[in-house]
Amino acid sequence: MIRLENLSKSYSGKPVLQELSLELAEGARLVVLGPSGCGKTTLLRLVAGLELPDAGRVSLDGRLASQPGWGLPPYARSIGFAFQSPTLWPHLSVVRNLTFGMNGASKSHVKETVEELANAFDLTGLLGRYPGQLSGGEARRVGLARALAMRPRRLLLDEPLTNLDGELKERIFKETLAFIEGFHPAVIFVTHDPGEAAALVENGASLLRLENIGRAA
């Protein structure tokens, strides 16, 4: 479960999020729709523990995760996240990026996961490459697959389908929804595309609209 209580965040004195509260149960999906600069990415970074709030609290599974001046580190939150600009490990191959953090899993599970994601996201021919050898769209698909690989309890997706071609975008969208059906994480999916948001709502997601001042519309 993800719970936000009166969450606020400013940059250089400019409010980005103001007193935002929401609760997302395990297995629930929330699509956050709004224009650039309304706080969508900031919301994800606060949930992930990459930033701390100026006011309010973030709780995960009933446990305090963030408040002003203190927060659990990202690795302690069971969160997978994929941002618009994928942060892949440049010195690791694609397959090593996918399996990073799966040290406790059996070899058979790791192999099965890599094969499943490679087939779903059209990565089979890229597994031996390094991030510097990937196009922007390829890197984005690897970043999305890596977010899913650990089957985290919470999944944060920041416009992961941006700049993908129409047919590939539709297939990756469907494959992502199919994959998460297998482990039912709480999902926050950020987009500025009303069509993308509508498709997610049709697949059972709730909708949160953010205005430019970071309040729920």
Language-model-detected regions and their locations in the chain:
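Conserved ABC ATPase "signature" region
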Residues: 63-67, 109-126, 177-181
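A short, proline-enriched helix->beta-strand linker immediately N-terminal to the Walker B motif
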Residues: 149-153
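ABC-type ATPase nucleotide-binding domains, specifically the catalytic core motifs of the NBD
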Residues: 12, 92-112, 120, 210
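Hydrophobic anchor residue at the start of the ABC signature
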Residues: 144
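Conserved ABC ATPase signature
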Residues: 130-134, 138
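ABC ATPase NBD coupling module
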Residues: 64-80, 104
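Helix-to-loop junction immediately C-terminal to a conserved catalytic motif
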Residues: 48
